[in-house]
C-alpha cells in the first residue's frame, strides 16, 4: 500500500513528480470528485461517509470537511481501515448504516464486482449515495489484482443491476487524450527508469491539449 504522502501526491500531482505519467488524469479525477461533492454532499453536512477500498485514504482531505464522519473500509491487512471486509467479501457493518459510499478506482481490482456493488447497496441507507469511479481504458495495474474494464453502457448496467439509479455520469478525459495516454504508457516501460519522467513531461502537455480541443 502506498504511503499517506503518496496519497497527497495523488490528489495534487506534479508533472516532475513520481506520478507524472498520470498527471492530467489524476487532476481531472480530483476535479470531478470535487464537483460531485459540491453537487451531492456539501449541502448535507451531517452525513456518514465510508471510502470503500480506501487504501491510504488519498481523498480524505477533500471529502472529510463536508461530512460528519469519514470512515475507511478495506481488507484486514490495511492497518488504517476503520471497517474491514471479511474474507467472504462482506463489509463488517450492519445494513443501512451509511449515507454515502465513496469508491474511487477500486471496482476494476475486485474479484467479484457484482458482490462489491451488492455490499455497497446493503450498507447504504434507502436514499443513500454511491460515488463511484473506475476505468474504461487504462493500462494493466495490479494492486494486487486488476481484472476489469467497462464501456459507459456496461458500467451503467452493472450498477443499475444491483439496484442503483444513476443520477450523474461523466467521463474523466476524452478518447483522443486517452489514446495519447495509452501511447505514452505503452512506451513508458520500454524505457530505462531515468528516462520515464522525461517522456511524461513531453506527453502530458499534449494529452492536456488534445483533451481540450477534442472534448466530448
Residue ranges of each PLM-predicted region?
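Short N-terminal secondary-structure initiator segments
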Residues: 75-81, 123-124, 134-135
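S-adenosyl-L-methionine-dependent methyltransferase catalytic module, highlighting the catalytic core
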Residues: 19, 111-119, 123, 129-216
Amino acid at each position: 500500500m502506498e504511503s499517506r504522502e503518496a496519497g497527497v501526491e495523488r490528489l495534487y500531482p506534479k508533472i516532475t513528480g513520481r506520478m507524472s505519467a498520470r498527471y492530467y488524469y489524476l487532476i481531472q479525477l480530483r476535479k470531478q470528485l470535487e464537483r460531485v461533492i459540491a453537487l451531492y454532499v456539501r449541502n448535507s453536512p451531517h452525513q456518514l461517509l465510508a471510502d470503500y477500498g480506501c487504501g491510504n485514504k488519498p481523498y480524505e482531505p477533500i471529502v472529510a470537511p463536508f461530512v460528519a464522519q469519514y470512515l475507511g473500509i478495506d481488507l484486514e491487512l490495511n492497518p488504517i481501515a476503520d471497517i474491514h471486509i471479511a474474507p467472504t467479501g462482506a463489509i463488517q457493518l450492519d445494513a443501512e448504516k451509511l449515507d454515502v459510499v465513496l469508491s474511487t478506482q477500486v471496482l476494476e481490482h475486485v474479484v467479484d464486482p457484482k458482490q462489491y456493488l451488492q455490499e455497497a447497496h446493503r450498507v447504504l441507507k434507502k436514499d443513500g449515495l454511491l460515488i463511484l469511479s473506475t476505468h474504461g481504458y487504462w493500462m494493466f495495474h495490479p494492486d494486487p489484482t486488476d481484472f476489469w474494464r467497462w464501456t459507459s453502457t456496461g458500467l451503467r448496467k452493472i450498477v443499475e443491476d444491483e439496484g442503483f439509479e444513476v443520477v450523474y455520469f461523466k467521463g474523466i478525459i476524452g478518447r483522443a487524450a486517452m489514446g495519447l495516454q495509452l501511447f505514452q504508457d505503452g512506451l513508458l516501460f520500454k524505457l530505462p527508469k531515468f528516462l520515464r519522467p522525461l517522456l511524461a513531461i513531453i506527453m502530458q502537455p499534449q494529452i492536456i491539449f488534445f483533451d481540450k480541443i477534442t472534448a466530448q
